[in-house]
Amino acid sequence: MGRVIRAQRKGAGSVFKSHTHHRKGPAKFRSLDFGERNGYLKGVVTEIIHDPGRGAPLARVAFRHPFRFKKQKELFVAAEGMYTGQFLYCGKKATLVVGNVLPLRSIPEGAVICNVEHHVGDRGVFARASGDYAIVIAHNPDNDTSRIKLPSGSKKIVPSGCRAMIGQVAGGGRTEKPMLKAGNAYHKYRVKRNCWPKVRGVAMNPVEHPHGGGNHQHIGHASTVRRDAPPGKKVGLIAARRTGRLRGQAAALASKAD
């Protein structure tokens, strides 16, 4: 009898929790207050830092506390072009400069934005990954909503009071850079999840995987499996509608979708 395969072992035990003790903290806007609703607040970027497990760099921004004689430090997702010593302005009367935070109703149509709120005051939800940005499509003053285009291409309607940062998230093109060596991949996945290195099924013995064994590395049978296959057999192309290269009409439809 074969061994319990990798796909079966994944289902056992508790859900993996990523290592968060060395993270720098949650990246979000300031809490929405009177100053941002009616004017603007001025802050300064004190440093640009790397957050383990996150692709985009973070910016530590210091604001003057509105009520006490001290500084308020916030962590923002850094926009492309942001630098240490830069002055940031948050509020409805802030200028349209990369890194500033404004409500959507104060941002013109066609502007590139990032770290957009979903609900007023939730401190940023959409377009936060490295290189991501959203685009303001239109404003509807009748019901005070704005229509934005998300990085996925989907359109979304959100309240015009939701805040957004001008510009796109820094760190674009990060995934295009080759790993070059296994050590880089090791450090990448060490802070993310327990999924590396990943041995191919055809490189295993037949006792360890349905694709294993043979005098050369080959699957040896059709790689498609039925939907109700038992867990030890359910590897490969699960319940595939079709396999192989797209030809003819299917290829034309796929290119249209892209």
Curated annotation (Swiss-Prot):
Where do the coiled-coil regions begin and end? none
Q: Which GO terms describe its molecular function?
A: mRNA binding; structural constituent of ribosome
Q: Which GO terms describe its cellular component?
A: cytosolic large ribosomal subunit; cytosolic ribosome; plasma membrane; vacuole
The protein's matches in PROSITE patterns, at most eight in alphabetical order, are given as: RIBOSOMAL_L2
| Species whose genome carries this gene | Arabidopsis thaliana (Mouse-ear cress)
- Mind telling me which Gene3D superfamilies this protein's record contains? 2.30.30.30, Nucleic acid-binding proteins (2.40.50.140), Ribosomal protein L2, domain 3 (4.10.950.10)
Provide the protein name: Large ribosomal subunit protein uL2x
Q: By which gene is this protein encoded?
A: RPL8C
List, alphabetically, the InterPro entries matched: NA-bd_OB-fold, Rib_uL2_dom2, Ribosomal_uL2, Ribosomal_uL2_arc_euk, Ribosomal_uL2_C, Ribosomal_uL2_CS, Ribosomal_uL2_dom3, Ribosomal_uL2_RNA-bd_dom
The organism's taxonomic lineage, starting at the top: Eukaryota, Viridiplantae, Streptophyta, Embryophyta, Tracheophyta
Q: NCBIfam families given for it? A: PRK09612.1
Indicate the transmembrane segments per the record: none
- What Gene Ontology terms for biological process does this UniProt record contain? translation
- Is Ribosomal protein there in the keyword field? yes
Q: Where is this region: Disordered?
A: 211-231
Q: Which family does it belong to?
A: Belongs to the universal ribosomal protein uL2 family.
Q: Which UniProt keywords apply?
A: Ribonucleoprotein, Ribosomal protein
Cite a single Pfam family from the UniProt record. Answer: Ribosomal_L2
